[in-house]
Amino acid sequence: VYDLYDLGEFDQKGSVATKYGTKAEYLAAIHTCQEYGIDVYADIVLNHKIGADGTEIINAEECNTGNREQETTGIEQITAWTIFNFPGRKGKYSDFVWTSKCFDGVDWDDKQKKNSIYLFEGKEWDKDVDSENGNYDYLMGADIDFSEPEVIAELTKWGKWYLDQTQVDGFR
């Protein structure tokens, strides 16, 4: 949920290997499964990002954690971890930089050192989601805004790249 392009190839967040090993080990595991007739489907998290590289000052409303459709404050400035520029990858495969424009909200205000759910000004939670907690679009981290054309374009580009790199049978 940090860098979708890093399959265990770049020194990022203190390690080159991911929880699946290096890129070579990951690709070998996929290939070995397929050699034995096992279809490989990757379980990819596309809802949110965690582990940002920098912060931005953003206007947001704090939401009721029991009902995310209810704001508990007016608009206030928060400091949110929303910049993802992947310095370890240095633009290889994609130079897209994720900023607050790419997200609906976060769960941490670094200014107040406060954990809560914050909806960015001018944004809304997705509608076609479970109604638990009023609206269960928000789960954790920086919630990706799928109404932004640049986000859709980047994730589409990544999906094609990922299928080409890994040769998996699909992903969800």
Language model features with spans:
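Substrate-binding/active-site clefts of carbohydrate-active enzymes
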Residues: 1-166
